[in-house]
Amino acid sequence: MKAHIHPPYRTVVFHDTSVNEYFKVGSTIRTDRVIELDGETFPYVTIDVSSKSHPYYTGKQKTFASEGSAARFRQRFGGFIDAKRKA
């Protein structure tokens, strides 16, 4: 194996700016920014979405009807079809 070809693996602080949460995670990401957290200095990366802010993980996900397209069609236009059959 070749020596010194792998990027350095270190603890990095990711900051979810949408909910102001910080995560310490092992990563090889490169950044010039640093932050002091818990008395230590870590590389710092901002992110827009994390498990603390994504609707799927927070339970604020919109649920769509599990019905098929035919059921939705009947729900929307069923009154017209029934009225025409009775006439």
Curated annotation (Swiss-Prot):
GO terms for molecular function: structural constituent of ribosome. One of its GO terms (cellular component) is ribonucleoprotein complex. It comes from Klebsiella pneumoniae (strain 342). Part of the 50S ribosomal subunit. Coiled coil: none annotated. Belongs to the bacterial ribosomal protein bL31 family. Type B subfamily. It holds the Pfam family Ribosomal_L31. This is Large ribosomal subunit protein bL31B. It comes from the Bacteria. NCBIfam families: L31 (TIGR00105), PRK01678.1 (NF002462). Keywords: Ribonucleoprotein, Ribosomal protein. The keyword Repeat does not apply. GO terms for biological process: translation.
